[in-house]
Structures are given as structure tokens and as C-alpha cells.
């Protein structure tokens, strides 16, 4: 029987970063037989009830009641991010299937878990689940063709103050981009969404520089050899998800940039 492959897709997302992660897994698949909704993993059934191989990178438990995935999914657990807010907020009593009972058994049956960040590793360690640091799959991204570099700095979902600061400190064109998806974007087909991702990544590849708050703008830039500056969030809720990558990507807080506590040469 021919091996069947599925891909994780989050149709209702408002962040194209989720689509970028899907695009990253797509490059490793010989073909796609099933598009599997990330938040409905517990209801997926393959056509002939065969096992479907799925790369399960991404951020899970937005709808914790839908965990674990069905037995029709043969998972490759890599580049996964989990938050323990479910336990912190006392939800584990309502959703015991996440980190206990058959939820934990899913991890045990499919370990080791490739963790996107150290925070997730520590969570897996606390559950005695075998794991390793895999980083994010978006650091493996590649695009067809060659880069055609342009004298443009893309600023992605940063504050107006940061945009104006950069404009006053460079001779290059500064252009704003966003990772927010509109309802119109959400209604596009899978293939259309992947085309939008490729167009965005091509812009990043061709840029002189990218300045962003978005992890899935910064990490693809590393893969595409584009200089990138990550503006750090002051919100501690982002710490576990982002701080693992501060050793890999140039980063600065907004206040340090605007106050010039740390100097950045945008014309280098």
C-alpha cells in the first residue's frame, strides 16, 4: 500500500506565521494526501482508515479538549511548542486528556518529542517524556530560484515609533508588512495560502534587512540568509516561547532601540 502523507493546517488562524510553519513541513513531504486541521486532530479519519504520516510541528493546545490525535495519524513529533498554562490555570481537571492519562500516553507512544524551545523541553522533562531540542522547522526553509536583493528594509508588526526611528536612521526604503490575516485571507484555499506564504518569504529573502516582533518572520530570515533584528516583547507571557531563540537571532528591546542604549546600524 502506498504511504499516505498529511499536513497540519490551521485554517482559522489570524497569523500567517502558522501558514509559514505549514509551508516548512510541506517541503519535506513527497506528496500531500490529506490536509488536517490542527484544532480537529481528534476527529480525523483517513479515507480507508489507513495510517497517515504527519509532521506535527507547531503550537498546540489552543483547543485542549481536542487532544490527543486519532490513531489514524502516524506522527513525527518535531518542532512542537506547548504551554503549561493549562495546568497553571487549573484546567487540567477539565481537560485531563492533555498531560495525563491517554494524552500523556500519546507522547509516550511516539517519543521522543522534538521541542521547538527550551520551555517545552522543561515541560516534557517534568512529565518524564523523552525529548530533544529540535528548534523550529522554519529555520530549514528554502525557496526556488535565487535571491534578488533590493534596497528595502521590511518592518513587520512593530510599533509606529520603531518604524519612524528606522526611517530616520537609514537611506534605504522602509516598508511595513504584517502577519495578520484578514477574513478574506482565511477563506482562501490551501494552495492559495501557500502561494501567499511563498510570496512573503520571497520578499524576506530579497530584503536588505527585516525588523520584526514576529518569531516566524525572524527565523525564516535566518534560513534565507537575510539580516534580521527581532524586537523583544516586554510581556513576560512571551518569554518561554521566544527567549530560546535570542542566542540565534540579533535582538533588542524597543526601549533600548529608541533610547539608543543599544546602537543598530541600519545602513550596514
Segments and roles (model prediction):
Residues 1-268:
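Active-site anion-handling motifs in enzyme catalytic cores
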